[in-house]
């Protein structure tokens, strides 16, 4: 039995809603992750220092709103380094379909296990929350839901529709999983209620997929972006990459070109940061000059907008990205 099948059967035997993280989460992935120690961890450079906010009032308000509506933010679940800045700015990336993922990507801090059934009232609660916070731009993402026949596509579509009805002035970006084995069904559903921006992250170079994205397929992800873009030519397609996982600058440039060849016009490139000692180690810290080079090359390739910087994340200042403003 393959590692994938073995891990899936072990997950199936666990109680729904039980969440596993760090070493417990990564115990059965195809390529084992060796836990880091202080001696093996690279020291963070000065340009990765994060400014802490002077006040947490805005942060507390957004967290309270999320709790009140039984919602999750990927900012919290994935331990994003920009949480304080984004929450203080009054923006958040909402994570629908629960906080338990069916996959075990070793770069990601989201918990793994058997997810609970989707909540039918989640789209309405999400729209109400947006209206309460007065957000003009929102990013909706999700865990992978390989347990669902549509991969969770209907929940995305319902959220987009509900927000359009309750908060018509709010622009919506969806950051979707790859809908493994369910692309036709998922696209048929998503095309009925398209967002303003369609985002799916490639994450890394194809050479590293078995290590970084076990269960995913490089060409499949490219095809997902291309097919949605062809069906919805007025919708911007977007993707994001991480650096520091063992790739070369040349490989990142090749992925950037592949994305352009598949119709993607918006790009983010940021530094990978290790969530815990049990996750994939950072193999290099990319200098800001290299990020500036990625941005220059992206413009040459024809990207309409590219945000490249050490702390840039896929949904970091997504409102500014969509408006074509500079993001660092």
UniProtKB/Swiss-Prot annotation:
GO cellular component terms, A-Z: cytoplasm
EC class of the enzyme, as a word: transferase
Binding site for [4Fe-4S] cluster 2: 101, 105, 108
InterPro entries, per the entry: Aldolase_TIM, Elp3/MiaA/NifB-like_rSAM, LIAS_N, Lipoyl_synth, rSAM
Cofactor(s) listed in the protein's UniProt record: [4Fe-4S] cluster
Positions of [4Fe-4S] cluster 1 binding: 75, 80, 86, 315
Membrane-crossing segments per the record: none
Matches recorded under Pfam families: LIAS_N (PF16881), Radical_SAM (PF04055)
EC number, UniProt record: 2.8.1.8
Ranges where the Radical SAM core domain occurs: 87-304
PANTHER family named among the record's database cross-references: LIPOYL SYNTHASE, LIPOYL SYNTHASE, MITOCHONDRIAL
Protein name as catalogued: Lipoyl synthase
């Amino acid at each position: 039995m393959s590692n994938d099948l073995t891990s899936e059967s072990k997950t199936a035997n666990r109680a729904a809603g039980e969440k596993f993280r760090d070493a417990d989460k990564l115990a059965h992935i195809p390529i084992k992750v060796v836990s880091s120690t202080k001696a093996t961890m690279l020291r963070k450079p000065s340009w990765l220092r994060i400014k802490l906010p002077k006040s947490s009032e805005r942060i507390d308000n957004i967290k309270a709103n999320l709790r009140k509506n039984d919602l999750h933010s990927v900012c919290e679940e994935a331990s994003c380094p920009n949480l304080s800045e984004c929450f203080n700015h009054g923006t958040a990336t909402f994570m629908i379909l629960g906080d338990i993922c069916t996959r075990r990507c070793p770069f990601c801090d989201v918990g793994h296990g058997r997810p609970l059934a989707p909540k039918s009232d989640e789209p309405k609660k999400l729209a109400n929350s947006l209206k309460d916070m007065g957000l003009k731009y929102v990013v909706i993402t999700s865990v992978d839901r390989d347990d669902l026949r549509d991969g969770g596509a209907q929940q995305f579509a319902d959220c987009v529709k509900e927000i359009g009805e309750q908060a018509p002035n709010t622009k919506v970006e969806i950051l979707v999983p790859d809908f493994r084995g369910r692309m036709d069904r998922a696209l048929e559903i998503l095309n009925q209620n398209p967002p303003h921006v369609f985002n799916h992250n490639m994450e890394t170079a194809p050479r590293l997929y078995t290590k970084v994205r076990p269960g995913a397929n490089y060409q499949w992800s490219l095809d997902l972006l291309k097919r949605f873009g062809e069906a919805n030519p007025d919708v911007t397609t977007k993707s994001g990459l991480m650096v520091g996982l063992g790739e070369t600058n040349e490989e990142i440039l090749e992925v950037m070109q592949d994305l352009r060849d598949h119709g993607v016009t918006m790009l983010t490139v940021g530094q990978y940061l290790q969530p815990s000692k049990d996750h994939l180690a950072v193999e290099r810290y990319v200098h800001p000059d290299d990020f500036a080079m990625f941005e220059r090359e992206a413009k040459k390739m024809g990207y309409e907008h590219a945000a490249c910087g050490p702390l840039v994340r896929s949904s970091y200042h997504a409102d500014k990205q969509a408006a074509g403003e500079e993001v660092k």
